[in-house]
Amino acid sequence: MSLVEEIERVGNIGLAESFIIDNKIVYGEIGDDIRSATFSPVIGYHTPSEMLDLVESRMYVGYHNPKHMKGIIARGPENLIEEERVKSAIKYAAETFDNKVYKVKHRTFDVMESKREKLDEFLNFIDMAMSGNWFKKLTMTVKSSGSPLKMSEKFYRLPFQQMLMLDVIVAMSARCDLGEYIGLILNYSKTILGLDNMSAEKINEIGERLKKNISGYIIPRRCGKSSFSGCMIALVMAMCPSAGIKCLYTAHKKNQCTDMYSSVEKHVVALIKEFNRINEAKFLELVNKYKARKKLYKGFYYKAAHTPGKKDGALVVSFYKFTEAGRNIKTTDIPMAVNEFRSIVYKQKDTHRGATYNLMFVDETNFLQPAIFNELFPMLNTDKAKMICTSSQKNGQDAKPFVDIRNTRQDGTTTCVVEYVCPNHCMSLIRQTNVAFTVCNCNIFSQPLHINAGAGVRKIMAAFSVKTNKNMEVDDDDDSKSTMLSEIGIMPPGLTKNDILGMNNLQNMRLTSELGRYHFLSKKSNVLKELLVEPDAYSKTVLLYLDPTPTSYRSVDSVTYDRSLHAISAIAQKKTGEYVVLGIEEFTTQKYEKESHDASKAMASIIMAQVTVIHKIYEHFNEFILIPEVNSFDLDNVWYNCGLLLREAVETTDMDDVSILAPCMITESENGTNGKAMFGKKRKIVSELEGKKVIEDPKTKKLRLEFDADGETNILDDYSDGMAKTLTELSTTFKELEHELKHSGKKYKIGYRMNGDKVGRFIDFFSNIFNRKKFTVAENLFSASLGATMEIELAEYLLEKLDNVVIRTDVNKRGKKSYSVSGKSSNKNQHCADDLAVSAVMATSLYNYYRDFKITPEEALIKLQPIYEQGSRL
């Protein structure tokens, strides 16, 4: 039996079987393991496999990809597909898809019989509202008597408008008692709703996510917030009879409410005409079809009429059921459904008390007194109500917002802040000239990551409209885009120090991103397990960075001791390149040497505790490189005390195979340094004349001799003595002095000196390591100083310190700009301690350099040796 005959045979047998032919053009060949799928025939979408993506079903033609519609064959329970069309599709599919046909089993219908009529009606509402260029006609108007609609312009829904549209549709499905079918509705209407690029699963997630009583939208000025809201209100009022809405629009200014009412009324008049025309035309078409079959059509159609508001400002749209085409609405007709709209300014408390609404648009929410919510919230508890809050950002003319929508995030609330920007688009927004484009279009919700890192919503406006003078009006400034980094609170991947050069107002720019923070806390490394599974999973080198705070001493009872806070971080690296924190310390030396007050000994104890514990726990790491930052602390003494403790560790534990290294700076000896300075200074006044050395004035090139009044040479006694001394000191020739300096002794000093590249290292760490998920902590994070005293987890404590690190811009009196890294400002002229964050960042930044270190004329690595006699320091 041929393929066509087989399909026709089976297709004529049952009502619960359909055939779907694989669309190789889009998805490729289906695997052998995928032979059947369950799908909902009402929308024509399968459940388990994206390969089977298109179905023509019982009564809804849901082509999701019309280009390949002939590749799909389906026979519904009422046999609605014409025979000729079936044969044509079968032939096309057999030739195009190499006879690959798969049988799909499905239920006959997924919608309750009592709700099929409502579903048809609601889908018709979506079709009418989304077609006919209504968004363009109702929003893109020119406010002048002689200008028509701007029909030549193309309308694009902004991301917030797309979300607002879906939000209203989901709310109306609930009002029409179809909330349980919202996934079905959105999937069926995906093309006209702009959801073509999304899978059925994702569309279902959108439907569930928007099932909230409250939604909040924070939108830049002049982006179509109010006009689009008015458009959606008018569409629902005129084309959704089953909703039975009582809609309220409220704002803080009377002219806004007046304009909204006028706009909605004008839109409703145009929409009702279209609604009545389409419904009557469909009714007549069905009547004629039934007449051709010599049957009587017993259906009906809706016809709408509106009543303008009077004193109470209510606009009423009434819907009447008619079974006769062309009939006019009479005053005696009883409406089958009514939609009402009111636009009321909120001037004082209790303005909205007593009324009942089930769809509320609260415009410019940031400017309204918060008492309004006490009046509106109770309405959300009944009758499947919905409240949509929209607002622009506060500007600099207002001290603070009345309502911070950002803080209303809760289970029953959906928020959409349009300024949400993903990291990949962050830099492109900053670099462009026009700061008005603040929306990232990579996501339908425009919110892959959050903007507004801890600041109030009112600061967002200032981020893009910086005032150079506080007394001036808010205007766009050339520096507006530069402040975006500090307001969005995220670190774009690949950002370098050069990207922020030239930017002003970089205040408290947070460096950590939400993606990096999530990875840091949720993807902790089980180092022991990883080493058991793969012994070479980690490098054998651990780098410890010591950030000793410049010593601050305090005197109590005639005893002086160090009160500074010091920090250490121990970092290892996986062979995959990811960095793992094995241990952290944050301590004061007084805590460990309360009697002797020996700060160096206390610091050495903490260092050796980290080394010993990490070596014993993992039995893998055998090279520890200590990087102590050079400042006023006596690091040589710390190194000496580490040698004493190493002797004890070697004698009592198995530490023979452990190497502890530290960088040291190589400098000239004291004699060599002084000699070089003397050589450079005196070279200016020494010259060789015929093999002898004489003193001459370097300016006049004359002998420095003084004369008496009678012309005789008179060398003063003190000058004579000084010249004699100078001649004695310069008895060495130039070549002899140069040779002596070249072969003078070297001086070695323990420590690492940061060469002014701190900002660059921090930007590189957060941009290319932390925010790219290459930095995490060990599950067994060790800390001798913090382990027993911390109220929160050590990893969270370290993350808190990293969160507090910010980039700051300082401009001196001369206008010279400089960038610095510090802890976030807590109080006036005070900053959060950043020592632990600095140690973690620097340990990671320097890891590869010192692990693969090669000696240079300025720096070397020296190995710690056990010290057996306290009298000698090696």
Swiss-Prot record:
Pfam family for this entry, one: DNA_pack_C
InterPro entries found in the cross-reference section: DNA_pack_C, DNA_pack_C_sf, DNA_pack_N, P-loop_NTPase
Signal sequence bounds: none
Database matches in Gene3D superfamilies: 3.30.420.320, P-loop containing nucleotide triphosphate hydrolases
Gene Ontology BP terms: chromosome organization
Entry protein name: Uncharacterized protein ORF109
Protein source organism: Ostreid herpesvirus 1 (isolate France)
